A protein has these predicted regions:
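ATP-dependent adenylation/nucleotidyltransferase module used to activate substrates
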Residues: 1-148, 159, 168-169, 255
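AMP-forming adenylation/ATP pyrophosphatase catalytic core
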Residues: 34, 116-348
Length: 348
């Protein structure tokens, strides 16, 4: 079995648990980003941490250079999406194209039977024999959302040793194994964007920023100008105060709509952000499809709360209104704890 080792505590423990269980284990770290990183993954130091943990565990460690594939499938997609007014989740695209496509393919070609990762989710078998992706025991760390694009074919080759553990248990196991990563902080933010330059600094020079005008969502009154509509996000409050400070209202104001084509965005109150309909793109099914009219649970962001909804092929109707999800984010569909499928959000 080949363990994808990021250099963090989770994948370190995944490798340790599998080895202790008697599996023939090797580790591999993907070199994905050629630039600097300070997010806690994708850096030179992370590769070194993974190598040293593998040495501690007494397993072979490989390094796969997938920088070209990462740039083409994840970074370029991230840049192009922003240029077109979408806000993608690069971790989901990395899982889709790198970890569970390119990495899995490399592992199988090298003769491994399966791969394992340190994600917090569970892979189980249904009574019919198909593979099921389910939420982790640790609901605060559950990562089934970012794995919701996986097909049954990928699930059949995936082992997730941490799905039945709490994060605190994982750190304790790492400490008991004397792993150098036992106290290493979790990775944060987008791995290929340094915190000192942020999203604006990263996109500057990679896309053409579109200046735009802010309008009041109810009165259509012109409120001010923004340098880049691509850098606005739905629900944003910071950075729009200059245009909204003269409004005679004590309520908080949010970006409620962004229209790149007409170079405008609207600002309104929280109620103007709430929606009950979310338009979906093509659905990727995990192991079964849904009939229109099916009642499901949906999750619209990595840390979002589940919401009951009715599924209608190209859209969902939410039982309770929620904040508008940004186009380009992912809608994960659940029945109970089981992931049924997912789709890119087109509009809301």
């Amino acid at each position: 079995m080949l363990v994808a080792m990021s250099g963090g505590v989770d994948s370190s423990v995944a490798a340790g648990l599998l080895k202790d269980a008697g599996h023939d284990v090797e580790g591999a770290t993907m070199k994905l980003w050629g630039g600097d990183s300070d997010s806690g993954c994708c850096s030179v130091s992370d590769v070194e941490d993974a190598r040293r943990v593998a040495f501690q565990l007494g397993i072979t460690h490989h390094v796969f250079n997938f920088t070209q594939e990462f740039n083409e499938s994840v970074v370029s997609h991230y840049v192009a999406s922003h240029q077109n007014g979408y806000v993608p989740n690069p971790c989901i695209e990395c899982n889709r194209h790198l970890k569970f496509d390119v990495f899995l393919d490399r592992a199988l070609r090298l003769g491994f039977d399966a791969i394992a990762t340190g994600h917090y989710a569970r892979v189980e078998r249904s009574p019919e024999g198909s593979f099921i992706l389910a939420r982790a025991k640790d609901r605060l760390k559950d990562q089934s959302y970012v794995l919701s694009m996986l097909t049954n074919k990928a699930l059949s080759k995936l082992v997730l040793p941490l799905g039945h553990l709490e994060k605190s248990e994982v750190r304790q196991i790492a400490k008991s194994l004397s792993l150098r990563t036992h106290a290493k902080p979790d990775s944060q933010d987008v791995c290929f964007i340094k915190s000192d330059i942020g999203r604006k600094g990263f996109l500057d020079g990679r896309i053409s920023f579109t200046p735009g005008t802010l309008y009041d969502s109810k009165t259509n009154e012109k409120l001010g100008e923004v340098e880049s509509l691509e850098l606005l996000t739905l629900g944003q409050r910071k950075g729009i105060s200059a245009g909204t400070s003269r409004l005679k209202t004590p309520t908080r104001r949010f970006v409620t709509h962004i229209d790149l084509d007409n170079r405008r965005a609207t600002v309104g109150e929280l109620e103007d952000l709430m929606v009950t309909t979310v338009k979906l793109g093509r659905i990727t099914w995990c192991n079964q499809s849904l009939e229109p009219g099916s009642v499901v649970q949906v999750q619209l962001s990595a840390h979002g709360q589940p919401n009951s909804a009715v599924f209608y092929d190209s859209y969902i109707e939410l039982e309770e209104p929620c904040r508008k999800p940004a186009p380009g984010q992912t809608c994960a569909l659940y029945i109970g704890d089981i992931v049924v499928g997912s789709s890119t959000i087109l509009a809301s």
